[in-house]
C-alpha cells in the first residue's frame, strides 16, 4: 500500500511539474509574441506617417510619384506583418489558456 501511495504521489508531482513547465513555456511565448506585435504596431504607424508625408510632398510637387508608391508599399507590407503578428499573438494566447487548464479543443 505504501509503495502504491508513493508511486501515486510521485506521478502526481511529476504531472504538476510538467504542467507548470508547460505554463511557463507558453507564457514566455505569449509575452514574446505580444512584445513583437507591439513593436510591429509602432513600426506600422511610422510607415503610415511616412506614406502620408510622401503623398503630401508629391501633391506639393516636391517629389515624384515613385516615392509615394514605394512608401505605400512599405506601409502595406508592414500592415501585413502586423496582421501576422496579431494572429501569432492570439494563437499563443489560446495555447496559454489551454496550458492553464482551459478546455479549448483542437
Question: What spans do the regions from the language model cover?
Answer:
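Terminal intrinsically disordered/low-complexity segments used for targeting and assembly
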Residues: 98-106
